[in-house]
Design a protein with these regions (language model features):
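A detector for short, charged/polar N-terminal pre-domain segments
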Residues: 1-5
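Short basic helix-loop element that most often maps to the first helix and adjoining turn
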Residues: 9-22, 82
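Residues in the recognition helix of alpha-helical DNA-binding motifs
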Residues: 12, 26, 37
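Residues in the helix-turn-helix
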Residues: 22, 33, 52
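Recognition helix of helix-turn-helix/homeodomain-like DNA-binding domains
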Residues: 29-45
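DNA major-groove recognition helix of helix-turn-helix/homeodomain DNA-binding modules
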Residues: 47-65
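Helix-turn-helix/homeodomain-like alpha-helical modules used for DNA recognition
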Residues: 62-83
């Protein structure tokens, strides 16, 4: 499993309408960890934290799309509640 890119994490949060603080809370990681992971220049996250963020976002309905020649991406697997 390839690690998440900073753009994928930011896009996943945007799809869920989550703030960085919400992602930090849901993943039980520090806000500074989330901010570093989302910064393309300092993208730095351990494999364990990457997996934690992936699992939290996937549980919330995000699906990560492999590069497949067109670049990695994200989409919602199911509609948000109330939509």
């Amino acid at each position: 499993m390839k690690s998440l890119s900073s753009a994928q994490i930011r896009a996943a949060r945007a799809l869920l309408r989550w703030s960085a603080e919400e992602l930090a809370r849901e993943s039980a990681l520090g806000l500074a960890t989330i901010r570093r992971a989302e910064n393309a220049e300092t993208h730095s996250m351990t494999a364990a934290n990457d997996l934690t963020v992936r699992r939290v976002l996937e549980a919330a309905g995000v699906e990560f799309i492999d590069e497949n020649g067109g670049g990695p991406g994200v989409r919602l697997r199911k509609p948000l509640k109330g939509e």
